[in-house]
């Protein structure tokens, strides 16, 4: 719950933990973390991710993440687990990458990342 998350984050911060990885799709994770980070946000690096593939959907998810996490910036925002076809969509005109680049240009995010469950996404044609 939110109170348990707050207690845990404060204990972790006191022990030197400073990195949080979450995602839009992790049910209430961003909301609980946003509540828990009040007053200690500057002690953490936040990474989150989205399954959005279009510019419009990604821009919406970035705004939702900022709102839920109760912050004005996110250090790392990632495209989460695209297939090869989806990766093409993400990079094409009107794709999610455009929204991420715009968010970085305005200071809403610092870094753009990619997560994958397949080596093929990172090394196309490698046979790995």
Show which residues each predicted segment covers.
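Glycine/proline-rich, positively charged
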Residues: 3, 10, 14, 55-128
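Acidic active-site catalytic centers that drive phospho-/nucleotidyl reactions
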Residues: 21, 49, 75
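Structural detector of well-ordered beta-strand residues that form the stable sheet scaffold
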Residues: 20, 45-47, 110-115
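Short, basic/glycine-rich phosphate-binding loops at helix/coil junctions
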Residues: 41-45, 77-80
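Short beta->alpha linker loops
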Residues: 24-28, 50-53, 116-118
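N-terminal binding-site loop/beta-alpha segment at the start of enzyme catalytic domains
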Residues: 1-44, 59, 105
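Short alpha-helix boundary/capping motifs
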Residues: 40-42, 48-49, 61, 94
